[in-house]
């Protein structure tokens, strides 16, 4: 095939000269005005092809372009159902940070009747790679995680687009988006693909790329980002006790925001968007997901937030993505509408009321959870369950608070019974789908104007488990060697440990084991103090009767210097674990806990007065 090098090198030189004369682009439109993802040949290489379980799979590379005079290449996995009689819908998957192209993701969507591409933008070794296999090669630039400063910078550098001037094209995100848009070109040129039915998805940094690609390329007909892609990252956010800012930019912050801020890509998205996340995600701040997607005009939008989780989902949220893609690319059943929600702040008794009305004309409603919080930090807040009650077609709940001087946040999750059970890798059979309402927020000034009163009171009972683990999130819940159960309840002023109190945990444990308890201070709250992890290990004698473990704050020792915890006042999380290793090296697998018998049955956790009371 004839080389595209002369044309692309000329294009790069033209961009360099024109930029030097005109200055850097000042908007998203200007940033992308000179890039045509279809213009140059892809020069596709098929490294390997095989057939498996009714699918045809290829390890491929396509040419991204010539950057600074050197070829840049993207490796990827591509697959499609064997023997398809008609053109297929297609999806492009963009992996997250520290990850690589996911062959499993390709197989999952091939199994659902798609052609699927998973690009290897990070350049890590491809799955099942053989010696000598070509991989992603960015040539003279490096937007991978070998060049981490380049994500929050538009300054020049030896591995950036320009070496002599500040420009948005120096940012890694520009180059990665360019490479992924070329992936759309790869897809639309495959003979088995319907080019008018292409969707995109990505998690974390891949969620960022999903929003960037959707905001720059109208070939995208549907998008499903997760835990990433929200704007306002360069803005300081008011928290209780200080300010938090997600990103600090090297270079002109205003120029970065105008050309690379997601809030300036959202208005350019012209396709339906389903956003998946955890309510406490560190990377995709919940409040700003809603702020950003509100800028998408005239398109169907849905939200699915997993309660209490950070950077992961419950199965009922995970299933929303393939079903969303199925509807818009394959004509599958429409998902229920976003639940209608409202609240009344001004009530006669001074207690706000939240009301949510699910889409009752679609799939059956199995349950509704109404949540509220008084913590402005989306990463660290505890979401209280307001225990909504059905009233006609709506569910409603009172939102009592301790202090109207704090802000108030509320939303609801509605669970619908699926028309048929769904399966996804590594998950149990999924029979329900979770959709979130809009997020409602009120400032202290708004609460004062509505005459909201302090009607709540502190509680010493943290949990009696009559509702199971509803206020917790569980990791490896069924694995006897690696189970971990966590709650943020202890950061809420209602359940914060009183001064001098002791932590009492009542449980039943069939065999003797060492229980590990974790107390985390200032998780994500650098504006309040340094994060610290405190560990307490106690051997519990096995038996059939309940027993109570009573702990002082000083029983928890700092994982770094073994200094004791002074008090409970700055706790953000409490963990119950078979084993926990705070300082485990990246990539090292944890050692099993050598747990004997069944996972403990926890019966009650409470604060008890100190011995003097």
Could you tell me what each predicted segment is?
Residues 182-246:
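Primarily recognizes the serine-hydrolase "nucleophile elbow" in alpha/beta-hydrolase
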């Amino acid at each position: 095939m004839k080389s595209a090098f002369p044309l692309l090198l000329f294009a790069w030189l033209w961009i360099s000269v024109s930029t030097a004369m005109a200055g850097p682009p000042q908007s998203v439109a200007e940033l992308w005005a000179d890039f045509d993802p279809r213009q140059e040949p892809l020069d596709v290489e098929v490294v390997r092809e095989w057939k498996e379980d009714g699918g045809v799979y290829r390890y491929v590379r396509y040419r991204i372009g010539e950057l600074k005079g050197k070829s840049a290449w993207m490796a990827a996995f591509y697959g499609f159902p064997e023997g398809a009689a008609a053109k297929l819908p297609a999806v492009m998957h963009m992996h997250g940070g520290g990850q690589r192209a996911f062959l499993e993701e390709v197989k999952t969507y091939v199994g659902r009747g798609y052609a699927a591409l998973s690009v290897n933008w990070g350049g890590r070794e491809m799955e099942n790679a053989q010696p000598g296999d070509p991989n992603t090669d960015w040539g003279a630039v490096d937007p991978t995680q070998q060049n981490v400063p380049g994500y929050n910078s538009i300054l020049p550098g030896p591995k950036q687009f320009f070496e002599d001037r500040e420009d948005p094209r120096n940012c890694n995100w520009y180059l990665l988006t360019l490479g992924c848009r070329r992936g759309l070109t790869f897809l639309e040129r495959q003979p088995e693909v319907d080019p008018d039915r292409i969707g995109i998805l990505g998690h974390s940094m891949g969620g960022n790329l999903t929003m960037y690609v959707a905001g720059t390329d109208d070939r995208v007909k549907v998008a499903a980002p997760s835990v990433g892609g929200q704007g306002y990252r360069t803005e300081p956010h008011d928290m209780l006790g200080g300010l938090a800012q997600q990103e600090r930019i090297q270079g002109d912050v205003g120029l970065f925001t105008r050309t690379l801020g997601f809030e300036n890509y959202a208005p350019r998205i012209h396709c339906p968007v389903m956003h998946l996340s955890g309510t406490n995600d560190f990377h995709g701040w919940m409040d700003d997901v809603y702020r950003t997607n509100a800028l998408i005009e005239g398109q169907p939008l849905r939200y699915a937030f997993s309660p209490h989780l950070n950077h992961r989902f419950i199965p009922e949220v995970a299933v929303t993505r393939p079903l969303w893609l199925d509807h818009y690319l394959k004509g599958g059943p429409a998902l229920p509408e976003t639940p209608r929600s409202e609240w009344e702040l001004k009530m006669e008794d001074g207690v706000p009321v939240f009301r949510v009305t699910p889409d009752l004309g679609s799939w059956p409603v199995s349950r509704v959870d109404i949540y509220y919080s008084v913590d402005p930090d989306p990463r660290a807040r505890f979401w209280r369950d307001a225990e909504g009650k059905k009233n006609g077609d709506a569910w409603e709940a009172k939102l009592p608070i301790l202090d109207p001087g704090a802000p108030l946040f509320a939303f609801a999750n509605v669970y619908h019974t699926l028309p048929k059970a769904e399966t996804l890798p590594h998950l149990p059979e999924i029979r329900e789908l979770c959709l979130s309402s809009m997020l409602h927020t009120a400032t202290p000034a708004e609460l004062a104007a509505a005459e909201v009163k302090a009607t709540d009171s502190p509680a010493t009972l943290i949990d009696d488990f009559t509702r199971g683990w509803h206020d917790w999130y569980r990791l490896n819940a069924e694995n006897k060697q690696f189970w971990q159960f966590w709650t943020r309840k202890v950061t809420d002023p209602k359940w914060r440990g009183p001064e001098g109190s002791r932590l009492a945990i009542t449980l039943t444990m069939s065999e003797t084991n060492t229980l590990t308890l974790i107390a985390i201070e200032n998780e994500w709250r650098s504006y309040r103090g340094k994060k610290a992890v405190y560990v307490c290990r106690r051997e519990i004698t096995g038996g059939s009767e309940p027993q109570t473990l009573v702990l002082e704050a000083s029983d928890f020792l700092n994982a770094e210097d073994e200094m004791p915890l002074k008090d409970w006042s700055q706790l953000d999380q409490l963990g119950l674990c078979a084993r926990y290793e705070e300082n485990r090296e990246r990539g090292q697998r944890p050692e099993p806990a050598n747990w004997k018998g069944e996972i403990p049955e926890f019966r009650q956790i409470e604060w008890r007065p100190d011995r003097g009371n």
